[in-house]
Amino acid sequence: MAAPAQQTTQPGGGKRKGKAQYVLAKRARRCDAGGPRQLEPGLQGILITCNMNERKCVEEAYSLLNEYGDDMYGPEKFTDKDQQPSGSEGEDDDAEAALKKEVGDIKASTEMRLRRFQSVESGANNVVFIRTLGIEPEKLVHHILQDMYKTKKKKTRVILRMLPISGTCKAFLEDMKKYAETFLEPWFKAPNKGTFQIVYKSRNNSHVNREEVIRELAGIVCTLNSENKVDLTNPQYTVVVEIIKAVCCLSVVKDYMLFRKYNLQEVVKSPKDPSQLNSKQGNGKEAKLESADKSDQNNTAEGKNNQQVPENTEELGQTKPTSNPQVVNEGGAKPELASQATEGSKSNENDFS
């Protein structure tokens, strides 16, 4: 009954193809490239943020990842797939064998197209997800940042942050708890231990509560080993939680603060830059204090001089003690983790991520 509706007669006598045929053809072209075409549970890869130029970001990502991927794992090899015979004379008369061979050739060609790095739809603007096969994303990204940190050589213009994603699951609290119980074991289960922090970011998702996610993940880490402690200054491990739509991306990274929150634009900057910035801010602070002291001496009011210092410290970027009051009411290390997640989300927004 549906076949006549798909092809309708036009005034010129021709036939118009139904929409279903175009949809199937488009879907077939996507599947022909091999592998998933969008971010989904069960993938490993690298989440990359950029600034309004995703196509250029993908090009830079391929170039950078292939360069360091070949250095760590060697170049990709497809000789086995390319040298497979295209036909067999002895099996031409056997229909069943010919069918099996055709299916095998299709599978082989699909596997050949599954490259080491493949861009997929992330589900968010200014975010690119590169699916990886046969490598460990956290080691590769750490190797890239370590080299850029040492050489101070800038290799990208569009890429902002590059976060390895070791696992993905559904972005529902129960699914995340179940997945994290086994995912976090290699780093935090006894006898393994370490200091940690949790960095949380959510995009295009409104059904997951930040404080609940951080509280549950922190509880899992402490349950795996009671000696795991929170350190927001220089943690040994940073648990990265990136939620996009209905997919939760997880990873555990090292040197998160040393490598400037895995920001490729910041990690190549000389250490002199922040010190100079702090010195400039300090000079401004001293100038303000001097002017305040002079005004206080003229007005003979000593109380105003004591109130000037907290205002300047807030201008230098320190957090206010009264922020996030709901999280502060909760005990233990969880309020610290929640405040860290707040700082992490703000920094991500500043990076156009």
From Swiss-Prot:
GO terms for cellular component: nucleoplasm. Residues 283-296 have a biased composition (Basic and acidic residues). PROSITE patterns: THUMP. InterPro entries: THUMP_dom (IPR004114), THUMPD1-like (IPR040183). SUPFAM superfamilies: THUMP domain-like. GO terms for biological process: tRNA modification. Residues 1-10, 273-282, 297-327 have a biased composition (Polar residues). GO terms for molecular function: RNA binding. Keywords: Acetylation, Disease variant, Intellectual disability, Phosphoprotein. Residues 1-20, 73-96, 270-353 are annotated as: Disordered. Residues 147-254 form the THUMP domain. The modification Phosphothreonine is found at residue 79. Belongs to the THUMPD1 family. Interacts with NAT10. Binds tRNA. This is THUMP domain-containing protein 1. It comes from Homo sapiens (Human).
